[in-house]
Design a protein with these regions (language model features):
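Rossmann-like dinucleotide-binding cores of NAD(P)H-dependent redox enzymes
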Residues: 160-161, 168-228, 308-314, 331, ...
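A Rossmann-like FAD-binding core segment of flavoenzymes
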Residues: 27-31, 77-79, 83-104, 111, ...
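Mid-to-C-terminal Rossmann-like scaffold of FAD/NAD(P)H-dependent oxidoreductases
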Residues: 2-4, 294-409, 440-444, 448-477
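Beta1-alpha1 glycine-rich phosphate/pyrophosphate-binding loop at the start
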Residues: 2-83, 176-199, 338, 417-420, ...
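Rhodanese-like catalytic fold shared by cysteine-dependent sulfurtransferases
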Residues: 430-440, 444, 451-485, 493-529, ...
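N-terminal Rossmann-fold NAD(P) dinucleotide-binding loop
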Residues: 14-15, 170-171, 538
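FAD-site-proximal beta/loop scaffold in flavoenzymes
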Residues: 133-157, 229-237, 241-320, 417, ...
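Glycine-rich dinucleotide-binding loop and its adjacent helix/turn
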Residues: 115-181, 217, 272, 277-279, ...
């Protein structure tokens, strides 16, 4: 037999390592140990199993050719030994043995290794609040809990649900409850927005409004402080500083932490973000590798360390570990946290840095915001997809892209293309000139990503001067905050009428194609905030006004297409 490879963890990175290593090292003796009875399942599919999109939990455990990934499958098809219900309790690095115990009997044993792989994943963070351990409070940490939750839904035991945490998993679970099952669902998020630190507030607001329109109550800026039990000891209420919400079930989706205790107790180098590894995913012990949610990852844009708990990355990392076990020397460049999330009839996605994150990382960052069509404007299924391109003004490097749109592949296509370019240090020019596939049913002749880059170019070269969304919203909430501002609305009169009626002198109407004739009628003592539907007409008007000496203008990036999705309180009633 060849080298003894022992892998701790059998969900994503571990099985991927084992299967790739088997293909590269036919003579290796490969063993996976996992403390659970279920292995190698699609954990990211759990919310869709709960929702009913995936009918049977066994589908999450099957291959694309419909074989269930269990111990027998791995042994017979892959030649890999899997020991389930076996907990790794220690690593004897000197003697190169993994210390394990049987979960049921407590019997202890050792497994010798030449190379060890730690892929222990992550563990849910449970808020340290009263009632967090009550019956009826669940984390989404494994398939067993998902089966239990779906069983309660299917038997009519859940009429109301509270999800604590407005991250991706929490929102996916909220949709799962509210959509198919019709459960009265509330989301409680401590931070002032959904998907905090991942997307910028204006994109979060669009997401929040859509979820509320689909029947989910969203309470941001208020964390859960207590979970109250009924007379049977079951969770029945969630308390925040502002309200008490009745519930039949509580989902604790407040993030995850790396499961790195085994490595730490063995004396390996760890950080708050996970097990420290080099670019070949070796730990501080060259005979021990690590992959998946349990490792610390370098951000490919900022260079900062972070935790990236994504099944896609875990599989990629597992392959790289196997390559290095076989001596191929494959390196891991890091990650950017690219994600896409379904939210009822919409989706939201991002890659790289948000504007807030980019500025916090020290970049001279700005953002081009657009609302382009996802396909030819004359095509029947055309829809707008608000996009944001974050860039560094000093270097023209693109730092991140965010998108929001209908539940199709339009946003995903732009996020994926952006991720590939950003990973290679792509600039505004690279994005502007990137050749994207085109046919009217799929895209516009000048793709949405190209258009966003062109806006970024105009901004970076100071051809286009913008008012930011936060600045515009603050002014709309209180005109006295910027008394020398006025809106110049160049949309069709039918679109403008309600605004001029409501806002009076603060709202100037001048149709786009009449500006060249009538610009002398514009007020000269005001800074004009030029508004159209998506920003294109506004920029052209700004360029023209500059040419005739009127330079006190600012463009609202993304136009009112963004505003309608954000549903501000000042919006005129229909």
């Amino acid at each position: 037999m060849g080298e003894k490879i022992v892998i701790v963890g059998g969900v994503a990175a571990g099985p991927k390592t084992a299967c790739r290593a088997r293909r590269l090292m036919p003579d290796a003796e490969i063993t996976i140990v996992d403390q659970d009875s279920l292995i190698s399942y699609g954990g990211c599919g759990i919310p869709y199993y709960v929702s009913g999109d995936v009918a049977d939990e066994d589908e999450l455990r099957k291959t694309s050719f419909h074989m269930t990934r269990n111990e027998d499958f791995f042994l017979r098809a892959k030649g890999v030994t899997v020991r389930t219900l076996t907990r790794a309790v220690g690593i004897n690095r000197k003697d190169k043995v993994l210390e394990v115990e049987d979960v049921k009997s407590g019997t202890k044993d050792t497994i010798p290794y030449d190379k060890l792989v730690i892929s222990t994943g992550s563990q849910p963070f449970v808020l340290p609040i009263p009632g967090a351990d009550l019956d009826g409070v669940y984390t989404i940490s494994d398939l067993h809990k998902a089966i239990d939750i779906k069983g309660k839904l299917a038997t009519g035991q859940v009429g109301k649900a509270v999800v604590i945490g407005g991250g991706a998993i929490g929102l996916e679970m909220a949709e799962a409850f509210a959509d198919l099952w019709g459960v009265e669902t509330s989301v409680v998020e401590f931070m002032p927005q959904l998907l905090p630190r991942i997307i910028d507030p204006w994109f979060s607001t669009m997401l929040e409004n859509h979820m509320q329109s689909m029947g989910v109550d969203i309470f941001t800026g208020e964390g859960a402080s207590e979970i109250i039990a009924d007379e049977n000891g079951k969770a029945c209420k969630v308390v925040t500083p502002n309200r008490t919400i009745e519930t039949d079930i509580v989902i604790m989706a407040t993030g995850v932490r790396p499961r790195s205790q085994l490595a730490e107790e063995a004396g390996l180098l760890v950080s708050p973000f996970g097990i420290v590894v080099n670019d070949r995913l070796q730990t501080s012990d060259p005979d021990i590798y690590a992959a998946g949610d349990c490792i610390e990852v370098s951000h490919m844009v900022s260079g900062q360390k972070f935790m990236a708990p994504l099944g896609s990355l875990a599989n990629r990392e597992g392959r790289i570990v196997a390559d290095n076990l076989a001596g191929l020397g494959t390196t891991y460049p890091g990650a950017m946290g690219s994600f896409i999330m379904k939210a009822f009839e919409r989706c939201i996605g991002a890659t790289g840095l948000s504007l807030e994150s980019a500025r916090a990382a020290g970049f001279d960052a700005d953002a081009a915001i657009t609302a382009p069509s996802d396909r030819a404007h004359f095509f029947p299924t055309e829809s707008k997809i608000p996009l944001q391109m974050v860039f560094d003004r000093r270097t023209r490097r693109v730092l991140g892209v965010q998108g929001f749109g209908p539940m199709n592949d339009a946003v995903l296509a732009r996020i994926d293309a952006a991720a590939a370019l950003i990973a290679k240090g792509g600039t505004i020019d690279d994005f502007s000139l990137c050749e994207m596939a085109y046919a009217p049913p799929f895209a516009t002749a000048l793709d949405a990503l190209n258009a966003a880059a062109n806006v970024a170019d105009n901004m970076q070269m100071n051809r286009q001067r913008n008012v930011s969304i936060p600045e515009f919203m603050a002014w709309m909430d209180d005109f006295s905050s910027q008394p020398d501002w006025a809106a110049l609305d160049v949309r069709h009169p039918n679109e403008v009428k309600a605004f001029t009626e409501k806002f009076g002198d603060a709202w100037v109407e001048m149709v786009y194609d009449s500006v060249r004739e009538n610009y002398k009628k514009l007020p000269t003592d005001k800074t004009l905030l030029i508004i159209c539907d998506a920003g294109t007409r506004s920029f052209e008007v700004q360029i023209f006004l500059d040419s005739v000496g009127i330079s006190n203008t600012l463009v609202l990036g993304g136009g009112f297409n963004m505003m309608t999705r954000m549903e501000p309180e000042w919006w005129p009633s229909k």
